[in-house]
């Protein structure tokens, strides 16, 4: 997957609550340059599932997966505690880019970029 394809797939993930619909639509997207008779590679499907899973994770889910509490998350990412509280409670939303970077830094996610 190229960086441009990854960017498109990541940004599109926010538009889909249903992971299966996301995978289906993106697997068949024009971004791959597939011909009408080409089969969809299994690794593409797996990569898309992983992108959607990572994009859908909330900050509390990221913290839980990493075994960290709110105080540890705040310190680890140098984010004010109040901001982290707002992200945990849902009072404010954390950007997709920040959530993906948190997962990368914590070893929970590795973007499938060639």
Feature-to-residue mapping (PLM):
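Short intrinsically disordered terminal tails
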Residues: 1, 67, 111-114
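N-terminal flexible/basic segments that precede or flank functional cores
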Residues: 1-51
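Recognition helix of helix-turn-helix/homeodomain-like DNA-binding domains
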Residues: 77-94
């Amino acid at each position: 997957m190229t960086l441009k394809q990854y960017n498109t797939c990541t940004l599109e993930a926010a538009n889909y609550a249903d992971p299966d619909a996301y995978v289906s639509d993106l697997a068949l997207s024009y971004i791959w340059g597939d011909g009408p008779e080409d089969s969809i590679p299994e690794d593409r499907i797996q990569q898309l599932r992983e992108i959607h899973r990572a994009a859908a994770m909330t900050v509390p889910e990221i913290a839980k997966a990493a075994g960290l509490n709110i105080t540890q998350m705040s310190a680890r990412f140098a984010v004010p505690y109040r901001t982290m509280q707002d992200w945990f409670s849902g009072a404010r939303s954390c950007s997709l880019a920040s959530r993906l970077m948190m997962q990368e830094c914590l070893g929970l996610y590795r973007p499938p970029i060639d």
